[in-house]
Amino acid sequence: MTMRRRLGAAVVAVALVGVVSGCSSSPSTAATVGNTAVAMESVDDAVEHCSKFINPSSELTPRQIIASTVIRGAVAQEVLDKRGAKLSDAERDQIVARNGMAALDSDQVCHTMVRSFAGVFHLFDLEGDRKAKADLSAVDVKANPRLGSW
């Protein structure tokens, strides 16, 4: 499976974990994850830099996949923070490489995005599917309607 397809498959799988509900209260906010605001600028930057890595045959647009990746990375971080768990950059980089996403390292914006998303893989590795899905779904997420339906 190509790196593009792995990223797309991972994002779609994680997007199915739970439905993002509600609306973000500010046009400059892509989502509110727990008490953390995810800036729309971070999604826009990631779309600009990382769309080239997304499989164009996907059922979701590159913007939807990338927005989901950015937001799910924040959701995973919220779960890790609640546990007091730390995941170093080196550990995140190992997860990225192990899951076939190292090509994203060629662009700093994409590298930052996928490093954040590595927290999702870490939770699945650490807890197993059922617990990780439950923990990720339990996080309160309000998405900006500009990002489409969730």
List each language-model region with its residue ranges:
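Bacterial N-terminal signal peptides that target proteins for export
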Residues: 1-11
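Bulky hydrophobic/aromatic packing residues
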Residues: 8, 51, 145-146
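Hydrophobic alpha-helical targeting segments used for export or membrane insertion
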Residues: 12-16
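C-terminal motif of bacterial Sec signal peptides marking the signal peptidase cleavage site
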Residues: 18-22
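N-terminal targeting/tethering segments
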Residues: 25-114
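PPIase-associated folding chaperone regions across multiple families
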Residues: 33-34, 96-150
